[in-house]
Regions:
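Short hydrophobic beta-strand that contains or immediately precedes a catalytic carboxylate
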Residues: 59-62
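Surface-exposed, charge/polar-rich loops and edge strands
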Residues: 1-57, 71-245
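Active-site-adjacent structural elements in enzyme catalytic domains
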Residues: 64-66
């Protein structure tokens, strides 16, 4: 199926239920500082991988945080790159999503760590994605250097579910992130995390902790640097974004 290089941001269908709002906010601030030329170049350098479904839906397989940030930064169109085209396929709905799961093109665990859920409940566009504070925590812990970025599929969701099982955030949600980053980093270097993607051995990780010795729970005291401190406040929250047209 022939497809224009640039597609409307809201024409793309998510293949996961949730994301981490803190990471989105961080990306939005970065993008808002760019000139129009810089932003165009940045978007061109970060094409959105998509799968075309038998029903001609453009399904995002990665970079959900990036495209959500694009929408909040008022980017109307993004560059896309087709990784699989099922537009001429006779696969049924169930068969298609089984294939998507087999190829690691879909992540059907919801924002509470439950699933896999039916793809019928996936949002029609990125405005309907839910916030998972544990996904934000996993991203912050990686930004702090407690585990390495890697090519494993959905690795930060693996880490988020690891932290979720420890009930670190309880009912605090996003607002409790600063309080638990230190505990999360300690868990990330423990033997319990040894089989998780991007795990760093305790000896190597000690260097990261030594470099962060001046921080309280590995978060800057002056709140002028670091992922949480530099994240701006979005003009509208996720609940409002679901109803925005």
């Amino acid at each position: 199926m022939k497809l224009a290089k640039y597609q409307p941001t809201l024409s793309l269908k998510p293949t996961q239920f949730s994301l981490g709002v803190v990471e989105v906010e961080y990306k939005v601030k970065k993008m808002m500082k760019m000139s129009r030329h810089q932003l165009k170049k940045f978007i061109d350098e970060h094409p959105i991988p998509i799968v075309i479904s038998p029903w001609k839906e453009l399904c995002i397989t990665d970079h959900h945080h990036f495209i959500f940030a694009c929408w909040h930064a008022n980017v109307k169109k993004v560059r896309v790159e087709i990784v699989k085209d099922f537009s001429n396929s006779k696969l049924s709905y169930v068969q298609f999503w089984k294939q998507m799961a087999k190829l690691n093109y879909a992540y059907l665990i919801d924002q509470f760590g439950n699933g896999p859920q039916s793809p019928l409940y996936l949002p029609s566009d990125i405005r309907g994605m839910a916030d998972d504070p544990y996904r934000s925590l996993a991203w912050i812990v990686r930004k702090e250097g407690a585990y390495e970025k890697n090519k494993a599929s959905f690795s930060e969701f693996v880490w988020s579910n690891f932290f979720r099982k420890k009930n670190l955030l309880s009912k605090q949600g996003k607002h409790g992130l600063k309080k638990v980053v230190g505990k999360a980093i300690t868990l990330a270097k423990s033997a319990e995390a040894a089989n998780l993607p991007g795990y760093i051995s305790p000896k190597k990780l000690q260097a990261v902790i030594d470099q962060s010795a001046e921080r309280t729970d590995y978060i800057p005291k002056d709140e002028k640097t670091g992922p949480l401190a530099t994240a701006p406040t979005l003009k509208s929250d996720l609940k409002k974004s679901k109803t925005k047209t």
